[in-house]
Each structure stands twice: as structure tokens, then as C-alpha cells.
Amino acid sequence: MRSLLLFTFSACVLLARALLAGGASSGGGDTGPGNRRREREALAAQKIEVLVLLPRDDSYLFSLARVRPAIEYALRSVEGNGTGRKLLPPGTRFQVAYEDSDCGNRALFSLVDRVAAARGAKPDLILGPVCEYAAAPVARLASHWDLPMLSAGALAAGFQHKDTEYSHLTRVAPAYAKMGEMMLALFRHHHWSRAALLYSDDKLERNCYFTLEGVHEVFQEEGLHTSAYNFDETKDLDLDDIVRYIQGSERVVIMCASGDTIRRIMLAVHRHGMTSGDYAFFNIELFNSSSYGDGSWKRGDKHDFEAKQAYSSLQTVTLLRTAKPEFEKFSMEVKSSVEKQGLNEEDYVNMFVEGFHDAILLYVLALHEVLRAGYSKKDGGKIIQQTWNRTFEGIAGQVSIDANGDRYGDFSVVAMTDTEAGTQEVIGDYFGKEGRFKMRSNVKYPWGSLKLRIDETRIVEHTNSSPCKSCGLEESAVTGIVVGALLGAGLLMAFYFFRKKYRITIERRNHQEESNIGKHRELREDSIRSHFSVA
């Protein structure tokens, strides 16, 4: 009996172990069928479908012709012997489709049309768009469809709200708000609290509007005062009105416009005596292109001398450039590819070109981690979360993405350090991840010290101190004005004497006529009386 009980107990223990083992293998453990399927997917070769939405119009700094070579360079790196081969399953390939975004609704239509044509099959990754009005609807749909979207654009302040409609967007280029943080650090360094925002606004793509919107929002949050003035530089500029606005607003002016427009404004304020240290002018040039102001005063025209003097009061804000050996190779390959398409320019590698290259690297890093965790390439939300709050090595140096999916921005301030030669150098740098602004100690500052002292409360007496006596007018124009004034005075005097003589003549004639009329009246009256009396 005792042996029977022992046998029964042993059998129950074995059965329980078997049941537990079976439950572990079939119930939600790490080795269940669902997880084994995910592991197989993670180890299997991946076909990553990428949709690139950028404009074909080469007037844009981020056109397909400019950015495509950078994307293909990155893909060769990750598919070849680079980091991608170590991170992704063997045999993984990227299939890329390039569509014209036209910087408008065509971007959204292209995405919807491709999904419809593929019977609902969606891309695994969206790169772009850049233009704000093109990116907004695509980002909303990407969030709805659970698609990761990486862009070196969509830089406006509105895209930083990632809690709802932009939840699947990562910005791999510094947003305008990051530049606003840099300006805030610069103002704190100089102990300034007020700024005038002066910008061009074409009411279409509104690049400068969105640029200075980032400054305005950051300043407003920190209690700094701003006033704003906008103009359309595609039309005739009222430079006098712009000067009056500056004189009546703030002493520190932040501007965004084309290089030629900035030069015209600086010449105007210089001719009104506003470049002698009472004002500080800043020009935003994030994209290293003349479209947004190239910071150069020289044009080879008769105004170069004045412009050089005026630019001694202008500082230019641009991206901090770092370079490593691989970047030089990358730049040469991009330049070669772009030139083959008939584009010849000085700056082949700009912020957008770098950004989309780094977007591929960031996506590969995130996808690797998601696959290792047992998820698939279709888990867009998981992938996009892995792109946030991390630092990785980009083509030009370290790239840091904050916890909100926006890249930290490193910026430099360029100023004229030699007023005789007109030489401009970097005088200070801002490091976005650290939130630190630092002036360089090995350069000569145009104002002579580390801090530019601007008294924001002192009233300035504005005088026209143009070095040219005619205030910018040609000598012949001045001569014409003087001769015209003399002729006008002569005509007025001639008219006065003619009018006086004519008046005397008229008065004499009227007097004679009145005398004759009186005589005729007397004769007629005498005749009537004579005849009446006779009757």
C-alpha cells in the first residue's frame, strides 16, 4: 500500500512537471509560436521599402537631384561592409521610390496613390517631405498608418507637438526652435532682453516667417520682448519705412531675407548713422546659401566700400560645421553626382543633404533594436521611439536627437574681425545638447570685448552720416535737382512780375471802359428826357 502511494505521488509529480513544461512552451513565454515567428522574421533577410518625397524643382536646396546621391551613398554603406551589414540580417535590401513632392499637396497624393496601387501595401519608411505645408498632411497620415517618418525638414515650431498628429515624425536637422534656443543663449550672454524681428514673407512657403517664429516662441516662453516687421522682397522694398521701424522699435535686430536684401537694408541703416555701435544686427543663414543670405558684403559694385563699413555691425548665425575624413569622401561623391545632372554650385553638401544621409543610418540603428526585441519592420511606432533620445555618429560628426524626436542644433556666429580687409570669422559657438554658448578667445572682436554692450533704454539721436555727400545719389542726379530748383524759382519770379504788369494793364483798361460807359449813359438819359418832355 505504501509503495502504491509512493508510485502515485511520483506519477503526479512527473505529470505536473510535464504540464508545467507544456504550459511554458505553449503559453506566452519566450519560446512560444508567436515569439518564434518573430525571431524568424528578425533573422530573415529584410526588404525595406522606402518612399522619398522631395521636389524635383532644382531651385530648392533639397531637390531630388541634390539629396538622392546622399541617400544612395548611405544605402551603399549599410548594405555593404558598413555598420548596416553588422546590424541587419544578411541579405537585407532597401527598395527606394523617389516621388516629386512639389512642396505641396502632391506629396500626400503620391503616398496615397502608391498605397492604393499596391492594394494597401504601405512603405516601411518615409523620408521627407521638407516643406512645411507638404510635410504636415503626410506626417498626420504616417501617424495614422503607423509609418516611421524621418525628415531633414518640417522645421517649423508646430511640428514639435508629437503627442498626437505628429507622433511618428523624427527631425534629423535642427528645427527653427533649436535656433531660437541658440539666440536665447546669445542674448543671455550679452544681457539683452528685447529684439526686433525683421523678415521677408512671401505668404507662400514662408521660410523666413517660420524661421523667426522659432525665435519668437522661445523668447516669449522666457519673457523676452519681441516686435516684428515683415515685407515681401519680391516687390519694391520701402527701405525708408524699414529704417523708421528699426529706429522706433528695438536696438537688437534679427533679420531673415535673401543676401541681396540684407545688403540693401544694411546700406540703408548705415546711411542713417545706425552702424556706429548703437545697434546690433543679426542675419540668419542656416542653409549656407545665398537664398537665405550668404553673409558677404562684396558684390563688385560701387557700394562695396559702404557695404564693408555697414557689415562691421552685422553678425551672421549659421550651422556649426565639423568635418572628419569620411565627410570629405562623401562630399566629393555627392559633388560628382550632382554635377553629372547639370548642377554647378559652390555648396553641394548643405544641411538637408547631410540630414537625409544620417536619416538612413538612424533608421538602421532603430530597426536593428526593434528586430532584436522581437518586433517587425511594420511596428512603426516602436521604430520611431528608438530614434528618439539617442546619439549616433553621422557623416559630419555626432548627431544627437532629443527625447521629443528633434535634433539638437550646434550653431556658430560669424562677424567681421578686420574692418579694413572686410574679413569675417566665426567668433562664437553654441552647443545645443549642452545648451551652452561660448565666445572664441582667439579672434578679434569688432567691438573690442567679449560682450557687445547695447543700452536698450537709451534714446538714440538718428542722423544721416553717409560718407557720400549726396546720400547715395549720383552726382548728375544732384546737379539735376539743383538746376531744377533754380529753374522753378525763375519761373515763379517771372510769373509774379508778369501777373503784376498784367493786373495794372487790366485795371487801366477797366477804368477807361467805365468812363466811356458813364458818358454813354449820360447821353442816353438826356435823350430820353428830351423826347419824353416833347411828348
UniProtKB/Swiss-Prot annotation:
Keyword Signal attributed: yes
Any Gene Ontology CC annotation: protein-containing complex
Residues with glycosylation annotation: N81, N288, N389
Subcellular localization(s) per the UniProt record: Cell membrane
Record topological domains on the Extracellular side: 41-477
Signal peptide: 1-26
Swiss-Prot/TrEMBL GO biological process terms: adenylate cyclase-inhibiting G protein-coupled receptor signaling pathway; angiogenesis; blood vessel remodeling; negative regulation of cold-induced thermogenesis; negative regulation of smooth muscle cell proliferation; osteoclast proliferation; phospholipase C-activating G protein-coupled receptor signaling pathway; positive regulation of nitric-oxide synthase activity
Family stated for the protein in its record: Belongs to the ANF receptor family.
Something else known: Has low affinity for peptide hormones in the absence of bound chloride.
PANTHER family for this protein: ATRIAL NATRIURETIC PEPTIDE RECEPTOR 3 (PTHR44755:SF1), NATRIURETIC PEPTIDE RECEPTOR 3-RELATED (PTHR44755)
Protein's recorded name: Atrial natriuretic peptide receptor 3
